[in-house]
C-alpha cells in the first residue's frame, strides 16, 4: 500500500518528513516529492503550495508519477464550530468548494459544472481516522464538512454569508476540495485531515501566524496515527 500525503505549507509537512525513513527526493515542475516509509507504510509526501490551482497540480503529478492507493490532505484550517478550539481536528465527512457559483445553470451553490456537489472521502480512510482519534490525548477531533476556496477567511460578514450557504461547515481552507476533485477524477480514494489554526474571524491573521506550527503538528500526528490503522 502506498499513500500520497499533501500539505500546502512547510509547517504542514515538516513533522511528517522528519519522521520518514529511507527518504528519497524528486522535484517535478518545481514541486518536491519525498518518497519513503512512515508509520510502516510506503508514502510520498509533498508540499503543494497554497491554493486550489497549486493543489491540483501537485495532486495530478503525485497520482500520475507515483500511483498512490490513497491520498491524504493534511494541514491547517479555519474553524466554524464553537465546540472546537485551536489545535483541534476536523476529519472530512464531505468536501465542497465554497467559492464556486454556477447556479444559473441548475447546479447547487459550491458545485462545479459536471462535478458532484460534494466530494465524499473513502470510508476506510475515515474509519481509520476515527480509530486514531482515541490516541490523540487532549486534542479533540470530529467529522464534518470542510469547504475550500481561494481566500483566507477573516471577515465576520463573509463568514456569516458562507454559513448561510453551508450551515454545517466545520472548517474552511484553501486546497482540500481541489485535491478531492482531482482524486475523484482519477478514481483515487482520499480523506482531508485539518487542524484548526484560527477561528475564521478578525483575529485569524494573528492566530494563524501564532498557531500554524501547532496545527501542523497536530494534523501530522493524526495522519501518522491514521497510517498505523491502515492494513
UniProtKB/Swiss-Prot annotation:
GO cellular component: cytosol
Gene3D superfamilies xrefs: Nucleoside phosphorylase domain
Molecular function terms, GO-annotated: adenosylhomocysteine nucleosidase activity; methylthioadenosine nucleosidase activity
EC assignment: 3.2.2.9
Top-level taxon of the source organism: Bacteria
Pathway in which the depicted protein is active: Amino-acid biosynthesis; L-methionine biosynthesis via salvage pathway; S-methyl-5-thio-alpha-D-ribose 1-phosphate from S-methyl-5'-thioadenosine (hydrolase route): step 1/2
Alphabetized Pfam families for the sequence: PNP_UDP_1
Protein name: 5'-methylthioadenosine/S-adenosylhomocysteine nucleosidase
Organism: Shewanella sp. (strain W3-18-1)
Gene name, Swiss-Prot/TrEMBL: mtnN
